[in-house]
Curated annotation (Swiss-Prot):
This is Putative dimethyl sulfoxide reductase membrane subunit C. InterPro entries: Electron_transfer_protein, NrfD-like. The gene is dmsC. GO terms for cellular component: plasma membrane. Induction: By anaerobic conditions. Its expression is under the control of DmsR.
Amino acid sequence: MADDDTTARRPVLSSFGTLGRGWLGVLALLLVIGLGAWAYQLQHGLIETGMRNVFSWGLYIMLFVLFVGLSAGGLILSSAPKFFHSQRYEGFARLGVLVSLGCIIVAGLLILPDIGRPDRIYQFVTSPDFRSPMVWDFGIVMLYGALNVWYLWLLTRRDLAARGSRLSLWVSDSAAGRDRDRTLMFWTAVCALPAAVALHSVTGWIFATQVGRGDWFSPLVAPVFIAKALVSGLGLLLVVSILADRFTAFTADRGELTSLGKLLGIFLAFHVVYLLAAERLPHAWAHHFGFWAITSNFLIGDTVYFWLWTGLGGAVPLLLLATPSLRRRTAVIFTASVLAVFGTLFEGIRLVFTGYQRVNINAAPGIATGGEYAGLTTDAWATAGTYTPTAVEIAVTVGVISIGALIVMAGLRYLPLQRAAPDAAYATDGGDRTQ
């Protein structure tokens, strides 16, 4: 047991080998390119992006939604067992919070290039308009990031103290201290679960409350966003866990991996099958009163993004995880998880396109795009929203994502993410409870 404890208190990545240093070099290069692209965008303005008046939310917001969901789902899955006094999936808790922290930092940073004038972001604090969902979302993102930092430190600080790390902030390792930490973990989970639900619900309501965007208005928007967070968050946690098990000293329990794969299948069924039907079927019935017309309207997607989400990112991983003989294989769990995250990405892309493709003034000349006017064509006006991300947007986005990847790499290198052995279950008063 002592050897197990000593091993658990070490980082799962003792040093960066050739592969690790190469990966760090790639991430650092992408970060530098991203910073350069952002500087170029700041100098020339948002005209360097593909966004215009008729399509004012682009790649930054699409991926903001994705990474908010990845973070919320990761923290929900890491904190829910502690809330219910369960030791199940304990081996994934620390890694899950680390991934959640990296994702929420990426999500928060993606706001900066989207607003065009990041030097004015302080006005969220100095002169907030509480009628705007954006103010609430900004506040929750900040609170959520701080909660992730606190929770990750709380989960690891005793092991950090046991090996004399300065990251423990001079906290000592003792039996009484660990008992107190168990109590704090419970109450942190009490705060983390509603915070995670609020984070992604408010993000969904930002879309639903936009004036003049009827395609986004739905009472199901918050449940859909929470389901999306559970699918993408668990999918990313499984991907990172399997990769960490393969390339570091982190050990992912095979039984719990299989169980989490089954749970991912349940989340996929609820999200892609039930909630999709609950949202689309009433609309189909309202427009078509024949059985085949209703069925075809429900099944036929609006765009290719619909099929990338529901087919490749929904039906395929669901079938893989619903087959008992397949979901026991780590490679199958990994593939299904990648596809689930991939599908969630295209669901977000489809969501933004759904709201912006149709404009409220569809008669000529339409809406001023806000772009350049050559004087020979009608490119200054548009009656339909179109969008293609520019190289500047892609470079900035990849640079921001590289920051999240670097945070996860740093956590693997410097934090004790492996649990040695199950502790006794804990009560809210800090005492032990036998299971």
